[in-house]
Amino acid sequence: MKYMVLETFRPGCKARVYERFREKGRMLPDGLRYIDSWLEKDGHRCFQLMETDAPELFDQWTAAWSDLVSFEIIPLEERERQD
């Protein structure tokens, strides 16, 4: 299943988020897959498209970042595209 993850950087933590990312990467547990991401123009929120069959893996991943970021994790319904 795919999920949209809204990350909101805690006040004053944006630089620390990127520093940790450079040092440790995304720190995703096996079974949680990053697909793509977009940064809001003001740079305070990031929207990440992710995929997993085990949504409980989000608990492990968010615990590694929760001191710097708050999360909203939204399950997505996949539908057939009609262009």
Language model regions located:
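Short S/T/G/P-rich N-terminal loop/turn motif that feeds into the first structured element of a domain
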Residues: 1-35, 39-45, 53-57, 77-83
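Short, well-ordered coil/turn elements that cap or connect secondary structure elements
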Residues: 29, 65-68
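Short, flexible helix/strand-to-coil boundary loops that buttress conserved ligand/catalytic motifs
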Residues: 62
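Conserved short beta-strand edge segments in small beta-sheet-based binding/regulatory domains
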Residues: 67-79
